[in-house]
């Protein structure tokens, strides 16, 4: 990680915070969640802990807890909303699901299982929480704090794809051919259980041969991430697409007269761009 120290503005931290608070007020950025919305979030989290998995399966969701999914996020992250499992299929395996690629019926070489945390499972339609989420729209990030879309009891707790716990998810199953083209894809509601909580640096080190992953993670994950990532980048170039890797900016007020800015690349490119925020999703979007 590269770091550079900038003396950009000589102001006490309290003044910086006050200025940011003024901006939030001017643009009506939400602050605390209304009590009614928080109460709903806490109630649905409690309900899930009691019998949520059983209710989800009874409602027709797939039991996908046999999949060795893992999450890949920055160190210390608690809002784990994506998990992935990559597989190399036996030779000439026919793809299942609706064909969406340029060559329907082509033999699949790889299978991507991609789970997205189902926050909607915890939001009663038409309730106070539903209305508040509609008002917020997205998480807003500022140098001093983030204004979350969901209450932390959900995003960091009941809905987060934490290790070794059952969670509701939208599960994509995407088959790719030997060139990395999409052969088929389907999505379904599912109950999943992450096997390991990994960091970008940890996975990149394993890809580079400079580290190992926990025994609970699939042993072929680093190699398949690099292999599939490279193929998907080739497909992107072939269709005229462009990838831009921008640094993640982390700003810390460290003293009265100094601001420290740490610029960390959003992902490492030694694996063909396979490990970067968003690129744990092996199939890119246009």
Language model region names:
Residues 27, 31:
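Alpha-helical structural modules in large enzymes and assemblies
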Residues 34:
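Conserved beta/loop motifs at nucleotide-recognition and modification sites
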Residues 2-8, 16, 20-22, 37-286:
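Electropositive polyanion-binding surfaces
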């Amino acid at each position: 990680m590269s770091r550079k120290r900038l003396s950009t503005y000589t102001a006490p931290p309290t003044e910086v915070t006050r200025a940011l608070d003024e901006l939030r007020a001017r643009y009506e950025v939400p602050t605390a969640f209304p009590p009614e919305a928080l109460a709903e979030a806490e109630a649905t989290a409690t309900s899930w802990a009691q019998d949520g998995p059983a209710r989800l399966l009874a409602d027709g969701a797939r039991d996908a807890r046999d999949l060795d999914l893992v999450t890949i996020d920055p160190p210390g992250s608690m809002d784990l909303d994506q998990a992935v499992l990559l597989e190399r299929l036996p030779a000439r395996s026919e793809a299942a699901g609706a064909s969406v690629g340029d060559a329907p019926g082509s033999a699949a070489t790889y299978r991507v299982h991609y789970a997205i945390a189902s926050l909607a499972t915890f939001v009663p339609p038409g309730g106070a929480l539903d209305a508040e989420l509609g008002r917020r729209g997205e998480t807003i990030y500022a140098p001093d704090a983030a204004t979350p879309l969901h209450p932390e009891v959900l995003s960091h707790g009941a809905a987060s794809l934490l290790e070794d716990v059952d969670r509701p998810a939208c599960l994509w199953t995407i088959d790719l051919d030997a060139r990395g083209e999409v052969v088929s894809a389907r999505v379904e509601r599912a109950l999943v259980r992450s096997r390991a909580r990994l960091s970008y640096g940890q996975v990149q080190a394993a890809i580079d041969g400079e580290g190992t992953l926990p025994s609970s993670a699939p042993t072929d994950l680093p190699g398949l991430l690099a292999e599939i990532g490279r193929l998907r980048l080739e497909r992107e170039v072939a269709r005229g697409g462009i990838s831009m890797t921008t640094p993640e900016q982390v700003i810390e007020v460290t003293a009265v007269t100094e601001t420290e800015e740490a610029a960390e690349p959003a992902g490492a490119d030694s694996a063909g761009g396979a490990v970067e925020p968003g690129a744990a999703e092996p199939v890119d979007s246009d």
